[in-house]
Amino acid sequence: MIKLEHANISATDVEAMTRFITTAIPSFRIRHEGLDTGGRPWRHVGNDDFYIAVSTVSERGNRKPYSNVSGLNHLGWEVDDVAALERRMVEAGYSVNLKAHEHPARRRTYFYDPDGNDWEFVQYLSDDPAQRNDYSDAS
């Protein structure tokens, strides 16, 4: 068995990043927090099975997702209701960065977090792996 236990994100504002994460994923909570050896705050935001470690950095990087520079392009999260997530995020002041075109087996929306990292949220409309994994519409 293998599963992703956590991810670690560097953030210029731990509070702002925590708000973004818990707005997008309301079941997540602050599991633990403290100060690193330099006295900067860090947090584990998640549930009993998975968390995102949020570490403080002093400046935002200049890498942009999909910019032909190596690095992470986006995090993809499966959700039950993309429309509800989108409403919740917009009501909290976040802007949709990309709303993917309609697909018969899925709905997707994307948001940038406060430090410019891209987050994808996908709702599958089918349990059939062939339909879920059909990317014939990808450009």
Describe each model-derived feature in a short phrase.
Residues 1-18, 73-75, 127-139:
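N-terminal beta-strand motif that seeds the catalytic metal site of vicinal oxygen chelate
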Residues 4-12, 31, 43-46, 63-139, ...:
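Vicinal oxygen chelate
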Residues 8-51:
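Core segments of cupin and vicinal oxygen chelate
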Residues 17-20, 85-89:
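Hydrophobic side chains in well-ordered alpha-helices
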Residues 30, 40, 59-64, 129-131:
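A short, acidic/glycine-rich surface segment
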Residues 53-55, 120:
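Conserved beta-strand in the GNAT
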Residues 56-60, 124:
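Acetyl-CoA-dependent GNAT
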